[in-house]
């Protein structure tokens, strides 16, 4: 179904369209699996995977407060096939989740189960990356037809940065999936606001809240959509808000009590309540406190408030502490293919003339910009990955590029299809093929270091970008191999908690410059 209700039938034959998507999906999965198998655990993966495994094994969420539990538990579910060691160390009993992550990672490295555990967890995220492509296809198709859906999905599947992030068991990909799913469900509700679709929207919103706390931004957006859509029918608007709120909260509770039926034990409850008490001045914590919410989830909001302090960051040769408003736009230029960025901008310019442009702005751009703004005002420039949902939603605009080519070259109602007009179908196929060829070339040449890839001329990447724009600790195993071939080298490398370089290496940070020389 096309949202505008007037788009012509697709020009790219369905067998070609589905064949292209199948090939790109196989490449995405194949490259993702290769890197999931070879890369060392990322910095955030240690905490996320260990806490997810603990939640499933002990039915206890004491190790989950910093971020919601759902994506961790989903990734941990197949990871149990590796038979991970789940130590009940002092850190476990004290609820020190970072220290317990150290214990988990170290114990599984010693037992030889670490790599298998993380590989199984990462396969879940690879599958979620494919699901994101499917949602982008569905979203763009509703506005621009199947050809537009093909372009949007292909852009996601072939961009090196997305491929690089798409195999790490962190929260960025799952939350992007949740955000896109909520946008699609909301579009369907706008087309026909039935009670069943209202409840479905509430369910997806609840899952988004159980995936990342910034899902609260999406909750505000959903409220505004319902109010605007039903503004002439206030009783129905109130009914819709009640249904969305009730179902979303029930889903949130279902996730948390499904994982921890008895709730946190008394000592953990006291610790979580103390964490919340330290953030009483926080508006977000206060609003969440007024909700009927699981304590573990509220403690996560408070924990994020504690973590939201100025941190060192750098980009394009500049370094600072805190946040910069220009960080994410510049990071996008330094990490994403120039052709893709130009196409996205051109697509949204063309989309301004779309008959459904207001709905496109309200249902695609509004949540994308809202999520972007919330991250922008935080003093944490941790990498482009934290605005991944916004970047993914921006890809929907690529679908608009198919329409002007088709309109210019298609036969008019009277004029015969002569001259250039006879080239319409080959031209559309050629444009799409050229974009895809350049994207696939970047995708293939970036492997097996997709995350570290940057487009020319911003190479080598580490001279231009830092943090998760280039490195999340995935190269630790390669650094270890390098250390073995050198005599006590000085090393500075990020790695997940519980892992060290070893091999006789010396710490570069804090070393005497005379010794390094």
Regions found by a protein language model. Give the residues of each.
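Start-transfer (signal-anchor) and selected internal transmembrane alpha helices
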Residues: 1-31, 130-134, 141-142, 151, ...
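Transmembrane-helix motifs of polytopic, lipid-linked glycan transferases
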Residues: 123-143, 181, 185, 349-353
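Short acidic/glycine- and proline-prone juxtamembrane loop motifs at membrane-interface regions
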Residues: 42-43, 161, 167-175
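Interfacial juxtamembrane loops and adjacent helix segments
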Residues: 61-124, 265-322
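Short hydrophobic alpha-helices at membrane interfaces in multi-pass membrane enzymes
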Residues: 152-153, 188-206, 368
């Amino acid at each position: 179904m096309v949202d505008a209700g007037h788009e012509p039938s697709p020009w790219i034959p369905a067998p070609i369209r589905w064949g292209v998507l199948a090939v790109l999906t196989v490449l995405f999965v194949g490259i993702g699996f290769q890197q999931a198998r070879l890369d060392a655990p990322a910095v955030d993966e240690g905490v996320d995977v260990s806490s997810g495994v603990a939640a499933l094994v002990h039915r206890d969420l004491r190790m989950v407060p910093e971020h919601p539990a759902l994506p961790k538990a989903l990734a941990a579910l197949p990871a149990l096939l590796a038979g991970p060691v789940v130590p009940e160390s002092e850190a476990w009993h004290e609820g020190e989740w970072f220290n317990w992550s150290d214990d988990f990672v170290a114990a599984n490295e010693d037992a030889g189960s670490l790599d298998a555990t993380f590989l199984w967890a990462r396969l879940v995220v690879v599958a979620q990356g494919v699901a994101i492509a499917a949602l982008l296809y569905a979203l763009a198709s509703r506005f621009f037809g199947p050809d537009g859906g093909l372009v949007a999905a292909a852009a996601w599947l072939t961009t090196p940065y997305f491929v690089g992030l798409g195999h790490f068991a962190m929260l960025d990909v799952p939350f992007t999936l949740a955000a896109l799913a909520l946008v699609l469900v909301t579009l369907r509700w706008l087309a026909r606001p039935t009670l069943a679709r209202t409840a479905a929207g509430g369910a997806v919103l609840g899952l988004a809240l159980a995936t990342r706390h910034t899902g609260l931004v999406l909750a505000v957006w959903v409220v505004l959509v319902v109010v605007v859509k039903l503004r002439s029918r206030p009783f129905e608007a109130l009914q819709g808000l009640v249904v969305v709120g009730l179902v979303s909260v029930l889903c949130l509770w279902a996730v948390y009590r499904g994982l921890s039926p008895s709730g946190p034990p008394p000592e953990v409850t006291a610790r979580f309540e103390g964490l919340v008490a330290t953030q009483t001045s926080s508006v977000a914590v206060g609003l969440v406190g007024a909700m009927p919410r699981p304590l573990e989830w509220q403690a996560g909001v408070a924990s994020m408030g504690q973590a939201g302090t100025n941190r060192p960051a750098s980009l394009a040769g500049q370094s600072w502490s805190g946040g910069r408003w220009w960080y994410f736009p510049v990071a996008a230029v330094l990490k994403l293919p120039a052709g893709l960025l130009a196409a996205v901008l051109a697509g949204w310019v063309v989309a301004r003339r779309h008959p459904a442009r207001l709905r496109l702005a309200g249902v695609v751009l509004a949540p994308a910009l809202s999520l972007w703004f919330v991250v922008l005002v935080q003093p944490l420039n941790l990498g482009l990955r934290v605005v991944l949902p916004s970047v993914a939603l921006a890809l929907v605009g690529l679908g608009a590029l198919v329409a002007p080519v088709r309109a210019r070259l298609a036969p008019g109602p009277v004029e015969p299809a002569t001259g250039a007009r006879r080239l319409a179908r080959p031209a559309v196929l050629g444009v799409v093929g050229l974009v895809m060829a350049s994207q696939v070339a970047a995708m293939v040449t970036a492997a097996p270091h997709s995350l570290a890839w940057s487009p020319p001329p911003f190479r080598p990447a580490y001279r231009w970008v830092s943090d998760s724009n280039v490195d999340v600790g995935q190269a630790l195993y390669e650094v270890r191999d390098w250390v073995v071939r050198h005599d006590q080298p000085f090393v500075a490398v990020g790695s997940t908690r519980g892992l060290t370089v070893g091999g006789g290496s010396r710490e570069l940070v804090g070393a005497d410059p005379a010794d390094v020389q």
